[in-house]
């Protein structure tokens, strides 16, 4: 049973990595070729096709994985475009409303998630997997049809034409301007090749993601070191745009530990709930419905009560301060589940209702990080890079789930297991406290970087 749970956890986080990797593709084709609306519409149909595959190929492994792949492509591809498309509806005259609308957008997402988390496990057990997978597919098709009907009501910005001063062209110029840039790029490529050579040991997904992180991370450092050398070959506005994006990517990198913790509520926390006492009619996975329900309560509470109260006391709750606190709250939630796991490992059974506390802490962190991060990412992106920067925001989720797979792979090593047991903890409890410490370290680093971060304003002109 433990091996089955571990395998399910690995499949889940691999799927999440795919969902949040494909935004890079979706953001690029939207900004460069098709525009955000067309990308959203056609990839939504791909998503519907993937749901159909899940419904029809429940007992066919190949068909089932094809369905998961199509959903990852469709869902991932539209993610950066939807949030950027929301931002496109605002300009300098009404940008003050953007935060409210982004919060409402996030609230509506969780409204749907509430019903999915609460009802899908019931449909799965009572009606079977084909119906449980088919219902979301039908609803997705209906929403796509509504999007098509309302197409004339939206502000649709055209894709950016080929630009000799694009982000990639400026980066290429900077990297090639001096030996330092070329060395960093070479080290990044070498690290990527080294990661790919580890595919037999780590698996394709982990190795490929590590290769991508190596190229982006080391390449980004090389560009930063040499960006001034691009002056004269590219206009100042293009160089400033690249610098702005690189600054944002540093913050995104520090958010990745939050996603490591957050997405495990659907895997590690569900497995913990299996060991707790609960009514016979209640399934462990239904506990996840608490997350979107709390989001729907916390977003209006924060905007109408908490933030105004803090402002009255002279404390301005900026986006970066909210995100710093959110990462820390996520870490605190994992201290709580870690303590609960220690008690469970000691043989003491207790109610699943105890998970309400860590869910509340994690959800507060989610509202502070995720809902805030969507609006922050959009506001910091130059006009021609809205889709791509939102894709990088989604990529931070991929990397967060990558850390989960890396840690899980690490604890399969006998020497690592021996070290953990010598510490007095069982493996699962040790991992929980490890992830909590990971989040606290990230919150500290994020807060320090945020103190000197120069905010930009890239909303379009009216």
Model-derived regions: residue spans:
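Extracellular/periplasmic helix-loop-helix junction of adjacent transmembrane segments
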Residues: 1-19, 94-100
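Glycine-rich segments within core transmembrane alpha-helices of 12-TM secondary carriers
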Residues: 18-23, 75, 96-147, 184-193, ...
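Conserved MFS/SLC helix-loop-helix module at the cytosolic interface between two early adjacent transmembrane helices
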Residues: 22-46, 51-52
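Hydrophobic alpha-helical transmembrane and interfacial-helix anchor sites in secondary transporters
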Residues: 29-30, 35, 86, 123, ...
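C-terminal ends and interior cores of transmembrane alpha-helices
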Residues: 42-64, 323-347
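Helical-face signature of the major facilitator-like transporter fold
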Residues: 68-73, 255-259, 292, 358-363
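Intracellular juxtamembrane helix-capping segments at the cytosolic ends
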Residues: 77-93, 266-269, 359, 366-381
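Intracellular loop-helix junctions on the cytosolic face of multi-pass helical membrane proteins
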Residues: 92-93, 99, 120-286, 301-302, ...
